[in-house]
Curated annotation (Swiss-Prot):
One of its GO terms (molecular function) is ATP-dependent protein folding chaperone. Its main location: cytoplasm. This is Chaperone protein HtpG. InterPro entries: HATPase_C_sf, Heat_shock_protein_90_CS, HSP90_C, Hsp90_fam, Hsp90_N, Ribosomal_Su5_D2-typ_SF. Keywords: ATP-binding, Chaperone, Cytoplasm, Nucleotide-binding, Stress response. Molecular chaperone. Has ATPase activity. CDD domains: HATPase_Hsp90-like. Belongs to the heat shock protein 90 family. One of its GO terms (biological process) is protein folding. One of its GO terms (cellular component) is cytosol. It comes from Streptomyces coelicolor (strain ATCC BAA-471 / A3(2) / M145).
Length: 638
């Protein structure tokens, strides 16, 4: 049949060059990736057969074969799984249809250490290309189960590949690597060595559900010269499901390799969680909390969910129903005993057993994270840095587990510049007479600490939570209170700190209010298009003015967030607060009292408001006018 030549997609060509000219020390990972791909193909075929989606497929002896030819220096990884059609080969191998491709290439180029570079291969799902680390040429022969025609794909990794339809091909996929010469100095081992292949499979793929068989060499003994008699194919892996084995029989290394296989990650997990339920509904769960957040964790297309098995039969790779969205970073396996093998996503969404598993897994993960804070503070700090923002989403969406989520959370605060605090600890440190838990949201810790809204709290030593994640704007309103203490923004509504420390008497406040009443009314009138009200502030000690929102209104940051989501948000007028102890405000009040019709007073009021807006990170409504007024004032000082 006709052989056609095609060019690789640009990203695929760049990736190939990185693989071909690889300097990564651990080139053994190529076999892990190819065996993992073969295992996935077998899983898909068995599931299709169970659902009668592949009536003509042969599922009598599903397995993976490894075959070496020392003379030809080839290694073949073969499976009799689902296989691929001609179109699938073109789509899946000729191009890289992955939204993270550019990110992958960038990280691959920047990875300095060998382990980091090797592991990125699996992380981004392009393991097939890893074969070019050890081979000058790669040939793939495949036939989709139930079809009569096969496909041959060949490339030397030089920017092009050939495709050919073939009449004779066994069911499944065979990848033949034409190996480069061994080069021990560059960690390029002899991958025709049976001993080396056994070592790699045992290390990376021992838990694979399907038998991985090493075939004897053609015409040889298949044992690297250990005997003259031909032998049967040797099964290299134990095929034991780790979650079904007693805990004391499974090593940390075995758990870590399973995690890497499931998550396509190269780093060890942060925490391993095992769970077993017996009785009327039995299941086993083996979950992993990663040590780092994937680059696409907050994108809409992020593939969340854990693997679902039924009686050790693989059902699906990303069962979203087993964990809520705010735990989408958790990876692992759930093996249920009493579900139907023909289960569908629609059934899963309504199945009470699945809901029961989700509740149990959620509570277990949350309690594990909470315990990490005291048992392993360093690991907890890593968890919170990587996944804290995701977990806090549950404070909005998961009211049933809100208390457990809060118990697992920690927040930056003014109490300690390095260590975040739990709400429980904040409450224990509250000043006598303090009734509220104070917080402020902002883009960064530095921006919040420099905000005028923080001045009185700093002066009186009142602790404030410093919240810098986008979700913080939402969850504080959803939660509302903790242990009877109201969560109160220092930038919204009126703040009364008089109970925490000696302050002005009511008589003094009343006198001051009368002294400034005229100025406040006049400024409210002249700034009416910009502000709802001008009033004296109890939160300022250094700055002349600040702008605040009413207690029930959206913050500017939250308004911007909703607008970015395409929602219309009516702009709310803010409140301008003046510091009656600041010299500028005192001078403005005297000037207004002496002569209320001076044009400069209106300009000063505008400038004061604009400066307050700038101080909180906003921008004046008319930047050009603000610049003009400032320039005029500066000119008068010279």
């Amino acid at each position: 049949m006709t052989t056609e030549t095609f060019e690789f997609q640009v990203e695929a060509r760049q990736l190939l060059q990185l693989m071909i000219h690889s300097v990564y020390s651990n080139k053994d990972v190529f076999l892990r990736e190819l065996v993992s791909n073969a295992s996935d193909a077998l899983d898909k075929l068995r599931l299709a057969a169970l659902r009668d989606d592949a009536p003509d497929a042969d599922v009598s002896d599903l397995h993976i074969e490894l075959e070496v030819d020392k003379d030809a220096r080839t290694l073949t990884v073969r499976d009799n799984g689902i296989g691929m059609s001609y179109d699938e080969v073109t789509r899946l191998i000729g191009t890289i249809a992955n939204s993270g491709t550019a990110k992958f290439l960038e990280e691959l180029r920047e990875a300095k250490d060998a382990a980091g570079a090797d592991g990125l291969i699996g992380q981004f799902g392009v393991g097939f290309y890893s074969g070019f680390m050890v081979a000058d040429e790669v040939t793939l022969v495949t036939r989709h189960a139930g079809e009569t025609e096969g496909t041959r794909w060949t490339s030397r990794g030089e920017g092009t590949y050939t495709l050919e339809r073939i009449g004779e091909a066994p069911q499944g996929t065979a990848v033949t690597l034409h190996l480069k010469p061994a080069d021990v100095e560059n960690q390029l081992h002899d991958y025709t060595s049976a001993w080396k292949i056994k070592e790699i499979v045992k290390r990376y793929s021992d838990f694979i559900t399907w038998p991985v068989r090493l075939l004897p060499e053609p015409g040889g003994d298949g044992s690297d010269g250990e005997g003259a008699e031909a032998r049967e194919a040797e099964t290299l892996n134990s095929m034991k499901a780790l979650w079904a084995r007693p805990r004391d029989e499974v090593s940390d290394d075995e758990y870590h390799e399973l995690y890497k296989h499931i998550a396509h990650d190269w780093r060890d997990p942060l925490e391993t969680i095992r769970l077993q339920a017996e009785g009327t509904f039995e299941y086993q769960a083996l979950l992993f909390v990663p040590s780092h957040a994937p680059h696409d964790l907050f994108t809409q297309g992020y593939q969340r969910g854990v693997q679902l098995y039924v009686k050790r039969v693989f059902i699906m790779d990303d069962c979203e129903e087993l964990l809520p969205p705010h735990l989408r970073f958790v990876k692992g396996v759930v093996d249920a005993q009493d579900l139907s093998l023909n289960v569908s996503r629609e059934i899963l969404q309504q199945d009470r057993h699945i809901r029961m598993i989700q509740r149990r897994l959620t509570k277990k993960v949350l309690s594990t994270v909470k315990d990490l804070r005291t048992s392993a503070p360093d690991r907890y700090a890593t968890f919170w840095r990587e996944f804290g923002a995701v977990l806090k989403e549950g404070l909005v969406t998961d009211s049933d587990n809100r208390d457990a989520i809060l118990a697992a959370c920690s927040f930056a605060s003014t109490h300690d510049a390095e260590e975040p605090t739990a709400l429980k600890d904040y409450v224990e440190r509250m000043k006598e007479g303090q009734d509220d838990i104070y917080y402020m949201t902002g883009e960064s810790r530095q921006a919040i600490e420099n905000s005028p809204h923080m001045e009185a709290f700093r002066a009186k030593g009142v602790e404030v939570l410093l919240l810098t994640d986008a979700v913080d704007e939402v969850w504080v309103d959803a939660v509302g209170e903790y242990e009877g203490k109201t969560l109160r923004s220092v930038a919204k509504g009126e703040i009364d700190l008089s109970g925490t420390e000696a302050d002005k008497s009511d008589a003094e406040k009343e006198k001051q209010g009368e002294e400034y009443a005229g100025l406040l009314g006049w400024m409210t009138e002249h700034l009416g298009e910009e502000v709802k009200e001008v009033r004296l502030s109890s939160r300022l000690t250094v700055s002349p003015a600040c702008v605040v929102s009413d207690a029930g209104e959206l913050t500017p940051a939250l308004e911007n967030m909703y607008r970015a989501m395409g929602q219309e948000v009516p702009g709310a007028k803010r409140i301008l607060e003046l510091n009656p102890e600041h010299q500028l405000v005192k001078s403005l009040n005297r000037a207004w009292t002496d002569r209320q019709d001076r044009a400069e007073l209106t300009e000063t009021a505008e400038l004061l408001h604009a400066l307050a807006v700038l101080a909180e990170g906003g921008r004046p409504k008319e930047p050009a006018r603000f610049v003009q007024l400032m320039a005029d004032r500066l000119e008068r000082t010279l």
